Structure formats: C-alpha cells, structure tokens
C-alpha cells in the first residue's frame, strides 16, 4: 500500500486562472484532510509552451507510517 499520494490539478491560462487553481487546490487539501490525509507539499508550475498551470499536491495517506 502506498503511503504517499500525489494529486495533480491542471488549468488552462485565462483571466484569474491562478486564483482559480489556488482555490481548487485549497478545497482539495481541505477535503483530503477531513479524510485523514496529511499535507506534505504543494507546488505550482507553469507550462509556458502548453498554456497550462499545474498544482501538484503531495499528501500522506491515513494510517500509514
């Protein structure tokens, strides 16, 4: 069983896309936290040539050491 999960959110560039992905990442983190996950890291990255912004969320699964 995996102890760590990495979630990815992808949004295309448009007005307020950075705020939208931040809010979606925050909502996902809160939802997973209530399920027992613990946050390890959040990283935002921009793919200049593809026109997307990504959020990578690393969380520790519940009841793992």
Predicted regions and their residues:
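Terminus-proximal functional modules
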Residues: 1-65
């Amino acid at each position: 069983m995996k102890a760590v999960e990495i979630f990815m959110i992808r949004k295309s560039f448009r007005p307020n896309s950075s705020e939208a992905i931040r809010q979606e990442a925050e909502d996902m983190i809160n939802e997973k936290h209530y399920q027992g996950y613990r946050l390890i890291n959040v990283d935002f990255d921009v793919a200049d040539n593809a026109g997307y912004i990504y959020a990578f969320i690393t969380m520790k699964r519940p009841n793992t050491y």
